[in-house]
Amino acid sequence: MWRWIRQQLGFDPPHQSDTRTIYVANRFPQNGLYTPQKFIDNRIISSKYTVWNFVPKNLFEQFRRVANFYFLIIFLVQLMIDTPTSPVTSGLPLFFVITVTAIKQGYEDWLRHNSDNEVNGAPVYVVRSGGLVKTRSKNIRVGDIVRIAKDEIFPADLVLLSSDRLDGSCHVTTASLDGETNLKTHVAVPETALLQTVANLDTLVAVIECQQPEADLYRFMGRMIITQQMEEIVRPLGPESLLLRGARLKNTKEIFGVAVYTGMETKMALNYKSKSQKRSAVEKSMNTFLIIYLVILISEAVISTILKYTWQAEEKWDEPWYNQKTEHQRNSSKILRFISDFLAFLVLYNFIIPISLYVTVEMQKFLGSFFIGWDLDLYHEESDQKAQVNTSDLNEELGQVEYVFTDKTGTLTENEMQFRECSINGMKYQEINGRLVPEGPTPDSSEGNLSYLSSLSHLNNLSHLTTSSSFRTSPENETELIKEHDLFFKAVSLCHTVQISNVQTDCTGDGPWQSNLAPSQLEYYASSPDEKALVEAAARIGIVFIGNSEETMEVKTLGKLERYKLLHILEFDSDRRRMSVIVQAPSGEKLLFAKGAESSILPKCIGGEIEKTRIHVDEFALKGLRTLCIAYRKFTSKEYEEIDKRIFEARTALQQREEKLAAVFQFIEKDLILLGATAVEDRLQDKVRETIEALRMAGIKVWVLTGDKHETAVSVSLSCGHFHRTMNILELINQKSDSECAEQLRQLARRITEDHVIQHGLVVDGTSLSLALREHEKLFMEVCRNCSAVLCCRMAPLQKAKVIRLIKISPEKPITLAVGDGANDVSMIQEAHVGIGIMGKEGRQAARNSDYAIARFKFLSKLLFVHGHFYYIRIATLVQYFFYKNVCFITPQFLYQFYCLFSQQTLYDSVYLTLYNICFTSLPILIYSLLEQHVDPHVLQNKPTLYRDISKNRLLSIKTFLYWTILGFSHAFIFFFGSYLLIGKDTSLLGNGQMFGNWTFGTLVFTVMVITVTVKMALETHFWTWINHLVTWGSIIFYFVFSLFYGGILWPFLGSQNMYFVFIQLLSSGSAWFAIILMVVTCLFLDIIKKVFDRHLHPTSTEKAQLTETNAGIKCLDSMCCFPEGEAACASVGRMLERVIGRCSPTHISRSWSASDPFYTNDRSILTLSTMDSSTC
């Protein structure tokens, strides 16, 4: 009973079966024991809140943040005990932070609600009661038969029942799911394919058994049990039968499908990506600083409490007559009184912890992330793709990268394959001037091969090979070549998953056949660019793939139409690294054609020119070409019957289907006869070499992680500049055992130590890497850390992630960045501190799972060197400045207790306590953190060495933290004691002889403080816009206007009128004005002097770069500023500003960028500054 109650409440959900049973059209059995399964409805819910739970749920989430919870505790303490400040002083800022965050999150959730309502309310047609019924998407139930028309989006995950084609096929595009723009073909089972009308579907009696929902877009296992004439027919269902929600129907008039997954159980919904939980180095530093300041806060409270009781213990200090304690108070527990006073001091000093820091940082990250998407330099016009920010929490981490791990294919290369060469039966052919011609024989070629080559001199007349879709059939003199290598070309034309589309008219006939079309009217689509390149090459030679259906593939060989019955497709997977098809030739012969990596095909071969082909494959790889080996096998009728039976059993299995299929595939793909190999070229992307060189100059180590073979990977690394010709290349490949691997690693470590070479490169393959990581991680890491570039080839996806994790947890704890474009790169993208997805041709899995997405690898340089640099500088200054201004704020409060005998009297008015962080000092730092550009973006991008100035979290080091903290304490001492010396003892500064009181003294300290911290922000600003001027000087003006207004009126709703006429009285004193100016100048003068001497004696590369940007009349030749002859009086001021700020207002600045500029050179050591045009002051 108790378990049932817990299940009903949702605490103990009932055990869920591994499979679900779906009755098509919801025709449930009328007799027998049947328990219907419960399925969710088809509503999509991306929102987090409802009207009823928004307030409690949002408050709970916000108070899980330590800082918010801390200030809540402070507020409750103020309510419970007698504290020196009003609860409003803590409650109002906390309320402001909570409210701003709640409004932001509420607005975002409201947008999600609107989006959900639009999707859930979309009209759909469902087959019910023998007719089509129009309803809304949210009303679709599991088991409903849904009709979808051309160009409509599937509202749920549907199993295809039929289409307007006789073979039951349809074309869809999944661009919105995985970004693949090619058309994919889905097929219905033969028994339902003929049910093309509502009336026919009404007679269908079928049950679908399939797996429970999972997020993998490409995985689906099930079976359909169809009852016809009291006989049950079982058909397997796979990914080719499933139409995913979010995909769009193309080139097909209409289809019918049965809903198997609905609502939040669809694959699209299960792939909704939650916000990244990665934490940046800045956030970790900020939390460390918070802990340090919390220790300072507790220390100040403890010291004040102890000193208070020490003073009270002295007999000469009697209680004042106005503060006499009652008998009950005197007899109360000293421990309780100590705790009460400690809490009161804690409340008094609590503003040293900046409550508004978190909300400011959150706003800065959110608003700042838009600049990446708006950057036209990161926009790729050809593909119409702009940079995307999937998480704004890591903006500043882009400025701290020390290691870049990159995929090769589609990331460094274009992933646009061009057929270049091939090896057929031990003979090489290459494309020269667009024609396929034979190369010379291999050294061990037989005489027969030589004579054969001499007899093929007519090959110069082969049809022209182009990269367009215009294919020409071969002339008659090519017949001999094609007949001689018939099986090779047939394998290329049949062993693939390429789809075909008529580019002139939609394919909406009874089948897929395009045999009546000219080859120029055909357009191929493929998820693999390699397959498309090979099929196009075969078509240009004269064997044209025309189309396919579920059971047939059609090929034109020299104009003659041939139809092959497609028996089975053995799909590609990353473990086997190959794919195969089993076809029945027109002669009735049953053949298997296999295609895959040389390491997966050659070990399975027992015949053919294996050694010659292996040599050719290595030669292709040395040229940087991608290679595939092609083989075949013939089956006898008995062998095929056994294979067909095993495949059917594996495909219809609901449990462990993938493992069973893998075992069957291994059984089938053996005893192959090698036909040859192909080589296609994948061109490097634009400016890849320059980008890698820039990363190296910035002090970033680049690792290439690829699945390609060793020779191909090394060749591409050399061509893209990852390896230099002068670099000492070390190799850790083909290791067979742990001991052999360990010995090789020790030899490499000795070579690195002994070789007097500046740079080393390391090549390691996947097998050797597994051995190295198993027992010798430390030795392997020692070798890697001493190499400038590392290339890992033959890598599996999980190996890529493991390598990155190994670097992440190394003693140096470097910041890592992974960049890739394919689904096999997702694991390493998620493992790295920062994941970059390339929006390439292998889908959008990488882009969807990344933190940032860009269209080209070359954009990485600006993303890191400009945006990363700016974001880090901005947020590092923001964090330090917040702690600095709060130290300035609270330290006078602490010092004041020594003069009021620790009576917990507050120095500032409660309104000032409340508004200091919210209104008076918040906007200048926020605008700075959004707009600051301490160096021109062109300089940062073209001088990558400047990136080193901010590496290793340098601006948030303990040294820098202590500087800002000490600066805050020193300024606070000047505020307090400067004001104290001004007022003095029994000194009258007013014309009527009155003296300043407690509130006037506190207001004077507060006024100097507001002006000083605001001007300090102005000194840190290098890039001035009208917005900076508005918020900087406007904040000071607002403070004065507010204080005059607040102190000039008696406010009836205030309990006390402490500030009435105080500010006006303060400003009426000339001495006060003089003191304010003197203290502000004194505070900032020390800071200015330090900046001047630092820039003069120890200028950083960034500070030198700042001096290349000239103000009117200033010519910057080196780290010293020189002025033209006849300098005017403003020169000294200009010199000082140039020393302090480094850059001037953009309204006066004059930049001169040209190809001869030093920032366009590759100088790695020194910065040579060019002469720039100057004008008189």
From Swiss-Prot:
SUPFAM superfamilies: Calcium ATPase, transduction domain A, Calcium ATPase, transmembrane domain M, HAD-like, Metal cation-transporting ATPase, ATP-binding domain N. ATP binds at residues 407-409, 531, 572, 595, 626, 706-708, 794, 800, 824-825. Mg(2+) binds at residues 407, 409, 821, 825. The modification Phosphoserine is found at residue 1154. GO terms for molecular function: ATP binding; ATP hydrolysis activity; ATPase-coupled intramembrane lipid transporter activity; magnesium ion binding; monoatomic ion transmembrane transporter activity; phosphatidylserine floppase activity. The chain crosses the membrane at residues 56-77, 83-104, 290-311, 342-359, 877-898, 911-930, 961-982, 998-1020, 1026-1047, 1066-1090. It is an enzyme of class 7 (translocase). PROSITE patterns: ATPASE_E1_E2. Its main location: membrane. It is a multi-pass membrane protein. Its cofactor is Mg(2+). Its EC number is 7.6.2.1. It comes from the Eukaryota. One of its GO terms (cellular component) is early endosome membrane. Residues 1-55, 105-289, 360-876, 931-960, 1021-1025, 1091-1177 are cytoplasmic. Catalytic component of a P4-ATPase flippase complex which catalyzes the hydrolysis of ATP coupled to the transport of aminophospholipids, phosphatidylserines (PS) and phosphatidylethanolamines (PE), from the outer to the inner leaflet of intracellular membranes. May contribute to the maintenance of membrane lipid asymmetry in endosome compartment. Belongs to the cation transport ATPase (P-type) (TC 3.A.3) family. Type IV subfamily. Component of a P4-ATPase flippase complex which consists of a catalytic alpha subunit ATP11B and an accessory beta subunit TMEM30A. This is Phospholipid-transporting ATPase IF.
